């Protein structure tokens, strides 16, 4: 058999067979960077993805500053969007009851949330950062972020309006010299009718949020003055309203004269003889006890 011919006697070209060329069209713009890897090396260089910029900051200030600003100083982190399978609650209207602290999605990633452990909390579509009750809300502000974006808190307060009776500005002091910034914030809170609370750590800020929510339904008895109902306590409270007369002087007078009637009937000299009273206190007490009552028309 002739090596230059095939089985049918057709002459074949000398040398190795020629390779067929295939052209695969590849649109470089349709390949998302970092998702699909091209099968063939292209002369067009793809943009590199900086993975270091996607790392989550350690503090809330770094977390908020690293996000792009929207509008006039407003920050809404890109991580505030609902995750897959997570549906934020609808907006909680002022006056609506809830057993949980309603947290705005813009606070996602705030280290303060790690220390809110004693009361439940959940994300919801609300205007303030935290809704602590039917008429109580809170805005969170880092002093480090405030120094870089001083107009941010003004816009937040304007958007908040008068929807809540008690509005708390919870400030985390995370700078070395906070005096000037705190002075400006204190003045702003007075004009905006807000309550300014300072926290020196995320843990302390979390405790403030927990306390506001835990005491939402409790009465104000702990803050009110407790008045004793017994006779001695009521007489002591009455006598101590006289200038320079203290509780010790009141007990001395009651022990010396025995009753309020005899105390009123005593002369100025008798009052001055009481130990620890003196002529000046005796004169003031005598004048008060013998002044005529004012008639209210």
UniProtKB/Swiss-Prot annotation:
**Cross-link Glycyl lysine isopeptide (Lys-Gly) (interchain with G-Cter in SUMO2), where in sequence:** 21, 37, 243
* UniProt region (Disordered), positions on chain: 1-39
Q: What is the effect of changing residue 228 to A?
A: Impaired interaction with ERCC4
The membrane spanning regions, by residue number, are none
| The entry's keywords | Acetylation, Cataract, Cytoplasm, DNA damage, DNA repair, DNA-binding, Isopeptide bond, Nucleus, Ubl conjugation
Q: Which residues carry this modification: N-acetylmethionine?
A: 1
List the InterPro entries. Answer: ERCC1-like_central_dom, ERCC1/RAD10/SWI10, Restrct_endonuc-II-like, RuvA_2-like
Any idea which residues the entry calls the DNA-binding region? Answer: 134-156
Record keyword Metal-binding present? no
**Keyword rRNA processing carried by entry:** no
In terms of Pfam families, this protein maps to: HHH_5, Rad10
Q: Which cysteines are joined by disulfide bonds?
A: none
Instruction: Give the residue interval(s) assigned to the motif Nuclear localization signal.
Output: 17-23
Highest taxon of the lineage: Eukaryota
**Any one Gene Ontology BP term:** post-embryonic hemopoiesis
Q: A GO molecular function for this record?
A: TFIID-class transcription factor complex binding
PTM comment for this protein? Ubiquitinated with both 'Lys-48' and 'Lys-63' linkages. Deubiquitinated by USP45.
Where are the stretches annotated HhH2, dimerization with ERCC4/XPF?
220-297
- Gene Ontology annotations for the cellular component aspect, listed alphabetically: chromosome, telomeric region; cytoplasm; ERCC4-ERCC1 complex; nucleoplasm; nucleotide-excision repair complex; nucleotide-excision repair factor 1 complex
What NCBIfam families does the annotation carry?
A: rad10 (TIGR00597)
Quaternary structure (record): Heterodimer composed of ERCC1 isoform 1 and ERCC4/XPF. Interacts with USP45.
Similarity comment: family membership: Belongs to the ERCC1/RAD10/SWI10 family.
Query: Which pathological condition is tied to this protein?
Result: Cerebro-oculo-facio-skeletal syndrome 4: A disorder of prenatal onset characterized by microcephaly, congenital cataracts, facial dysmorphism, neurogenic arthrogryposis, growth failure and severe psychomotor retardation. COFS is considered to be part of the nucleotide-excision repair disorders spectrum that include also xeroderma pigmentosum, trichothiodystrophy and Cockayne syndrome.
Write down what this protein is called.
Answer: DNA excision repair protein ERCC-1
State the species of origin. Homo sapiens (Human)
């Amino acid at each position: 058999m002739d090596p230059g011919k095939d089985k049918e006697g057709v002459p074949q070209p000398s040398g190795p067979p020629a390779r067929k060329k295939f052209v695969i069209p590849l649109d470089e713009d349709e390949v998302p960077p970092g998702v699909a890897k091209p099968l063939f090396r292209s002369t067009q260089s793809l943009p590199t993805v900086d993975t270091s910029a996607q790392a989550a900051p350690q503090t809330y200030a770094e977390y908020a500053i690293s996000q792009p600003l929207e509008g006039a100083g407003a920050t809404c982190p890109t991580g505030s969007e609902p995750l897959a399978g997570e549906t934020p609650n609808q907006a909680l209207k002022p006056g609506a009851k809830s057993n949980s602290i309603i947290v705005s999605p813009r606070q996602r990633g705030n280290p303060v949330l790690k220390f809110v452990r004693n009361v439940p909390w959940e994300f919801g579509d609300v205007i303030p950062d935290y809704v602590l009750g039917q008429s109580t809300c809170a805005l969170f502000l880092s002093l480090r972020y405030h120094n870089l974006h001083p107009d941010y808190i003004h816009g937040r307060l304007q958007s908040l309006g008068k929807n809540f009776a008690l509005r708390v500005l919870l400030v985390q002091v995370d700078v070395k010299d906070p005096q000037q910034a705190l002075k400006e914030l204190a003045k702003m809170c007075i004009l905006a009718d807000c309550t300014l609370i300072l926290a020196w750590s995320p843990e302390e800020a979390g405790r403030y949020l927990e306390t506001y929510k835990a005491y939402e339904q409790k009465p104000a008895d702990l803050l009110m003055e407790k008045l004793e109902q017994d006779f001695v306590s009521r007489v002591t409270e009455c006598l101590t309203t006289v200038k320079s007369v203290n509780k010790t002087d009141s007990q001395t007078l009651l022990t010396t004269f025995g009753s309020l009637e005899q105390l009123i009937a005593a002369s100025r000299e008798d009052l001055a003889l009481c130990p620890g009273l003196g002529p000046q206190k005796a004169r003031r007490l005598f004048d008060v006890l013998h002044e005529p009552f004012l008639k209210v028309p």
